[in-house]
Amino acid sequence: MPAPRAQEAVTVSVFAQRFSATRRGARLARRLATHRLDLWDLPYGSPASDTVTLVVAELAANAVLHGRVPGRDFEVRLTYDRTAGLVRVEVSDTHPGHPELSDAAVRPSADADGGRGLLVVEAVADRWGVAGRTGPGKTVWAECAVRVPDGPRPVRA
């Protein structure tokens, strides 16, 4: 009988969830993303968690406010590559309109209630963009470099 081989460490983790295209859905997306990051050893209140959570909050809010199609949900997908020290955030909706990358360069007036979501994402993410998806709509994505925790991952019960 061959000797047992050691299991390779999991270096990529994925979280994906669909949410109702409502403000409540956007809040829930942000909260669940923060919880998932904590489970991935990017703890609450850490710079990595705060940055990724902010990106999720802005992209989810945009999906609800600008990408909402009645009766359709939006999806959030987080991919954490521990080896690369990178979290990729993807928010997909079914609205056919695509934000222009140049939209982030248009500054809203100081007293405007909104219009800063992509500016915030551009400021805190290392890269971001828009991609098509299977079916109607688009995926707005952002990548955030994160500090990889030192030492072995703690075992959670």
Annotate each language-model stretch with its function.
Residues 61:
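Short alpha-helix lining the ATP-binding pocket of the histidine-kinase-like ATPase
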Residues 1-16, 20, 64-157:
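Conserved beta-strand-loop-beta-strand hairpin that lines the nucleotide-binding pocket
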Residues 35-57, 110:
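Conserved short strand/loop->alpha-helix "switch" segment adjacent to the catalytic nucleotide/phosphoryl-transfer site
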Residues 18-23, 45:
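Short, N-terminal intrinsically disordered low-complexity segments that are rich in Pro/Gly
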